[in-house]
Amino acid sequence: MFPALETHLKQTIPDPYEDFMYRHLQYYGYFKAQRGSLPNSATHQHVRKNNPQYLLHGSLGGKDDLIPDTLQKEKLLWPTSLSSAVHRQIEAINRDSHMLSLPHLRSRQLLYDELDEVNPRLREPQELFSILSTKRPLLAPRWPIECEVIKESIHHIEWAPPQPEYFYQPKGNEKVPEIVGEKKGTVVYQLDSVPTEGSYFTSSRVGGKQGIIKELAVTLQGPEDNTLLFESRFECGNLQKAVRVDTYEYELTLRTDLYTNRHTQWFYFRVQNTRKDATYRFTIVNLLKPKSLYTVGMKPLLYSQMDANTRNIGWRREGNEIKYCKNNMDDGQQPFYCLTWTIQFPYDQDTCFFAHFYPYTYTDLQCYLLSVANNPIQSQFCKLQTLCRSLAGNTVYLLTITNPSQTPQEAAAKKAVVLSARVHPGESNGSWVMKGFLDFILSNSPDAQLLRDIFVFKVLPMLNPDGVIVGNYRCSLAGRDLNRHYKTILKESFPCIWYTRNMIKRLLEEREVLLYCDFHGHSRKNNTFLYGCNNNNRKYWLHERVFPLMLSKNAPDRFSFHSCNFKVQKCKEGTGRVVMWRMGILNSYTMESTFGGSTLGSKRDTHFTIEDLKSLGYHVCDTLLDFCDPDQTKFTQCLAELKELLRQEIHKKFHELGQDVDLEESWSDISLSDIESSTSGSDSSLSDGLPVHLANIADELTQKKMFKKKKKKSLQTRKQRNEQYQKKNLMWKLKLTEDTSEFASTLQKHPAFFKNSESSSFLPMRNENPRLNETNLNRRDKDTSLDPSMTTLILPKNKGRMQTNLNRRDKDTSLDPSMTTLILPKNKGRMQVLHLIYCI
């Protein structure tokens, strides 16, 4: 009568709808159950309600993932959080993961509070677009199938150093390392299979490469063995090889961006089995940039697990004898540069990490967004959606932040602000600035509430999750720099960029976009600054510089207005900043935050900390309020200051050129691009163009075309044919005998040898008329004579056609069947000439 209430009723015939939804959701990674079984949706919702923060660990998207595997089980994993205690729970759950095995219910609409009690209620409707909520699980990161990934959970605490971390001051006696490599050293760590140039991304899965994870580090021979144990097969990790060249000295090789042979800048790896009293030297041997902030005092980052556990100390700047220079390696293609430093570890048998900058992983982002989605207050004005899926199938998140409007007219009047980060995966600076912005805009601060009242914020916190996960520095899994492809039409190859541009295009149709800003990191300049676009409209002249100037006043010890640049270069046409500007967003910027630190004010010669970067996110919000203040006093003052700064810059430029000019009348008509220098160029132009899989096909087609061109003879012009004919004619004359008069008399003495000689004429021999009707020599040879020692031989008709190829000019001609005349030498010496005459 009431089958839905029979909790232990076995379902022998699968429900078609349930079966369809199971297969559909399994494709997106929500279920990994045993073959032939169906998920208990009521049970899943019960678990999610009581334990909202869990990860569904499994693989999806690959061919093998579409078919349920009897050996695969559904694992419930707690996500990374800010508490180290929670992370210890993660590892325990990983070890003792279990599978939901409860009887399936017929009804899909009734739920139960307890498994043993009958208290049915209707299921709540699921949200269509929200991904992270108490009702939906997080998806684990997906890796290319070539990448091995360790199962350990890596987590770091946030920490602000109590004292400023000053730049390293070079002493001038820093050691220049001599790279010896594997010949004189011992390889102690090396990745087996690294996708490089020539290969391309094909598929992905959770956990990366299938099979048993190999132990790449060396095996210690005993407790006295002091060899360091290296590891980098985790999120954002990057280290390809480590070579031990001395007891405490190691040469390190970074992995290039996947499917490329370039972009070695970001590093992040783990070392174990440390010794406290020893001085270690590390040398990265394959860096590609000739300039670096390491030359002006930047230090690497060190993280000690023992310090984090016992003293609550996180990442800190460490290192001595730091030197960045060109190394002695030469592969014949491009020069390499090396970074070397020495360090003393704080503990014996410690687990430590080195990094180029403060890491911020895809899992860190997901945990932050999960906390927002589960916050009952923040979730009211922050809606989380999926913009798209990356090439590997990872979610690209889109946040819409605004307070609910009272009327439709009020909602339509709101202007929009678009912010994005991590299009370059190795620039984790952008994620920390973005986190500072989100912390403030989602807070209950009166300024934050006001901003939510007047703006609609569209936030893309991580545009390139694939690159972040695998530890790339600049490229996506397409092997290309996404910040050069904002004009792309290749949606399948660059989905993150294509959908971002499309979203902004639709947004512009709905409302005005006041500001677009993409958060980046810079490896060759200190401080923070903006790149913008000069406005050619005289009505809004210099308006694009007001926001950067205001930001420099709000953060005077971190932001440098004089480092800003507004020149639009041709090589930057594909960047987000320029494309959005051409789409109509006047205030379109790229914010560059240094990997180093500040040279300004109270923070002069100190490294940026995580808190410094997060404060920049707050200052973006503060500057937005100043920029949009109905009282235009600040705006007007900044505009006047900009005009004065520009006047001084123009005077300086003309003074450098040795010219004097009166700028009282027409100085505002001078093009701003003419007085601005170009931005310090990046090496992204090398990663522009087609995605690598299409580039490989294009290269193959080009090679085939070139081969065909070489094989096929090109047609000659008339002029070339005439020149070739004259040259051959001259060579022919030189081979003939010198006595032309005797040849003429020979022809007169033997007229019978030539049939119809009276009516014969000398016709030129052409390819289109190989059969000649004349008995005389070809017109090309009419001025030549045969040697008198020659004799003529008339061959009878029944001998058949004579096939000869002695004369290449006549190789395509056929002999007349009636008569063939050969002129042969009398003596047995070398033949001087052999000529065929065809008769009618």
Swiss-Prot record:
Activity regulation information from UniProt: Inhibited by RARRES1.
S-S pairs: none
Keyword Protease: yes
Listed GO biological process terms: protein side chain deglutamylation; proteolysis
CDD domains: M14_AGBL2-3_like
Domain annotation Peptidase M14: ranges: 358-628
Composition-biased stretches (Basic residues): 706-719
Pfam family, one: Pepdidase_M14_N
Binding site residues for Zn(2+): H424, E427, H520
Location in or out of the cell: Cytoplasm, Cytosol; Cytoplasm, Cytoskeleton, Microtubule organizing center, Centrosome, Centriole; Cytoplasm, Cytoskeleton, Cilium basal body
Superkingdom of the organism of origin: Eukaryota
DNA damage in keyword set: no
EC number annotated for this UniProt entry: 3.4.17.-
Active site: E592 (proton donor/acceptor)
EC top class, as a word: hydrolase
Cofactor: Zn(2+)
Bound cofactor: record note: Binds 1 zinc ion per subunit.
Protein family according to the UniProt entry: Belongs to the peptidase M14 family.
Subunit structure: Interacts with RARRES1, KIF11 and MAPRE1.
PANTHER family per the UniProt record, alphabetical: CYTOSOLIC CARBOXYPEPTIDASE, CYTOSOLIC CARBOXYPEPTIDASE 2
Name under which the protein is recorded: Cytosolic carboxypeptidase 2
The species this protein was found in: Macaca fascicularis (Crab-eating macaque)
Organism ancestry: Eukaryota, Metazoa, Chordata, Craniata, Vertebrata
Gene (UniProt): AGBL2
